[in-house]
C-alpha cells in the first residue's frame, strides 16, 4: 500500500439488529482507528440472502449513528461487489488455483469433517458443484495484536476450502479478503469467533500476492448461560434510548479507563475521552468473557 495511514473497518452482516456483542466489535475497531488518527470504514456483508433480515442493514446503520460511531466515506455493500468477486475467482482459475467439487457435507463428515481433496484432480465441471481453492500456501500460524502468536489447526489450515458455494453464493472468506484489499484495510479488529478463519484469509492474500492486514481479535461477550451473545442466540438489540450507558458498559468490558463524571459528558465527549484513553493492551487476553461485569 502506498498510503501508510491506518484504515480500519466494521463489517456486520444484516442478519438482525446490533446487540451488545456487536457494539464491542464496533467500538473496539472504531477506537483503534481513531486513536491511530485513521479512517474507519463500514461495510455491510449482505452476500447471504437466506440469512438476511429485511430492513436490518438500514437499522444497523441507524444504530451506529445513534451510538456516535460515525464512519468515513460511503458504506460498501457486498451485494454490489459481485463483479469484483467474479474477477477474483476467474484469476484464481487462470492460475490453476481452484477446482470444482461435488462432495456433500455428509461425505466430508464421514471422512472426519475436514475435506480430503477428493475432487482435486477429477476435472469436474461447474454443474451442481462448489469451487474450492487449490491450497498451495497454507498458513499455520499468525500474530494477533492482542493474543500474540496463534497456532492454527493444521488439517484445517491445509484444507482446500470453498470460495464459491454450490448454491451460487460467494463464500465469506473470498468476499472479505477481496473487499478488505479493495478498501485498503490495514488492521482488522473483530471478535475472537473469527480467529479460526483468519488463517484461510491470510492464505488467500498470499495466493493473490497481496499484503495481509494486521489482526486484533477482541474477547467475545457471553450471556448468563455461557453462550456467545449473538443474533442466533437471540441477544437483545441495543437500547434505543441514551446510548452512553451501553458505551460505558462496552468500555468496561474492554477494561478501559472511564471518566468518573461520564454521566455529565455528551456522547461526543465520552467517545473523545475513550479515544484519548484507548489502551488495547489492557483488554483481557481471554477469548471469551461474561457480558455483565
UniProtKB/Swiss-Prot annotation:
<keyword id="KW-0030">Aminoacyl-tRNA synthetase</keyword>
<feature type="short sequence motif" description="'HIGH' region">
    <location>
        <begin position="12"/>
        <end position="22"/>
    </location>
</feature>
<protein>
    <recommendedName>
        <fullName>Glutamyl-Q tRNA(Asp) synthetase</fullName>
        <ecNumber>6.1.1.-</ecNumber>
    </recommendedName>
</protein>
<dbReference type="GO" id="GO:0006400">
    <property type="term" value="P:tRNA modification"/>
</dbReference>
<feature type="short sequence motif" description="'KMSKS' region">
    <location>
        <begin position="228"/>
        <end position="232"/>
    </location>
</feature>
<feature type="binding site">
    <location>
        <position position="172"/>
    </location>
    <ligand>
        <name>L-glutamate</name>
    </ligand>
</feature>
<comment type="similarity">
    <text>Belongs to the class-I aminoacyl-tRNA synthetase family. GluQ subfamily.</text>
</comment>
<dbReference type="InterPro" id="IPR014729">
    <property type="entry name" value="Rossmann-like_a/b/a_fold"/>
</dbReference>
<dbReference type="InterPro" id="IPR020058">
    <property type="entry name" value="Glu/Gln-tRNA-synth_Ib_cat-dom"/>
</dbReference>
<feature type="binding site">
    <location>
        <position position="231"/>
    </location>
    <ligand>
        <name>ATP</name>
    </ligand>
</feature>
<dbReference type="GO" id="GO:0005829">
    <property type="term" value="C:cytosol"/>
</dbReference>
<keyword id="KW-0862">Zinc</keyword>
<dbReference type="GO" id="GO:0005524">
    <property type="term" value="F:ATP binding"/>
</dbReference>
<dbReference type="Pfam" id="PF00749">
    <property type="entry name" value="tRNA-synt_1c"/>
</dbReference>
<comment type="function">
    <text>Catalyzes the tRNA-independent activation of glutamate in presence of ATP and the subsequent transfer of glutamate onto a tRNA(Asp). Glutamate is transferred on the 2-amino-5-(4,5-dihydroxy-2-cyclopenten-1-yl) moiety of the queuosine in the wobble position of the QUC anticodon.</text>
</comment>
<feature type="binding site">
    <location>
        <position position="45"/>
    </location>
    <ligand>
        <name>L-glutamate</name>
    </ligand>
</feature>
<dbReference type="InterPro" id="IPR022380">
    <property type="entry name" value="Glu-Q_tRNA(Asp)_Synthase"/>
</dbReference>
<keyword id="KW-0067">ATP-binding</keyword>
<dbReference type="GO" id="GO:0004818">
    <property type="term" value="F:glutamate-tRNA ligase activity"/>
</dbReference>
<feature type="binding site">
    <location>
        <position position="101"/>
    </location>
    <ligand>
        <name>Zn(2+)</name>
    </ligand>
</feature>
<keyword id="KW-0436">Ligase</keyword>
<dbReference type="GO" id="GO:0008270">
    <property type="term" value="F:zinc ion binding"/>
</dbReference>
<feature type="binding site">
    <location>
        <position position="190"/>
    </location>
    <ligand>
        <name>L-glutamate</name>
    </ligand>
</feature>
<feature type="binding site">
    <location>
        <position position="119"/>
    </location>
    <ligand>
        <name>Zn(2+)</name>
    </ligand>
</feature>
<keyword id="KW-0547">Nucleotide-binding</keyword>
<feature type="binding site">
    <location>
        <position position="115"/>
    </location>
    <ligand>
        <name>Zn(2+)</name>
    </ligand>
</feature>
<dbReference type="GO" id="GO:0006424">
    <property type="term" value="P:glutamyl-tRNA aminoacylation"/>
</dbReference>
<dbReference type="InterPro" id="IPR049940">
    <property type="entry name" value="GluQ/Sye"/>
</dbReference>
<feature type="binding site">
    <location>
        <position position="103"/>
    </location>
    <ligand>
        <name>Zn(2+)</name>
    </ligand>
</feature>
<dbReference type="InterPro" id="IPR000924">
    <property type="entry name" value="Glu/Gln-tRNA-synth"/>
</dbReference>
<keyword id="KW-0479">Metal-binding</keyword>
<feature type="binding site">
    <location>
        <begin position="9"/>
        <end position="13"/>
    </location>
    <ligand>
        <name>L-glutamate</name>
    </ligand>
</feature>
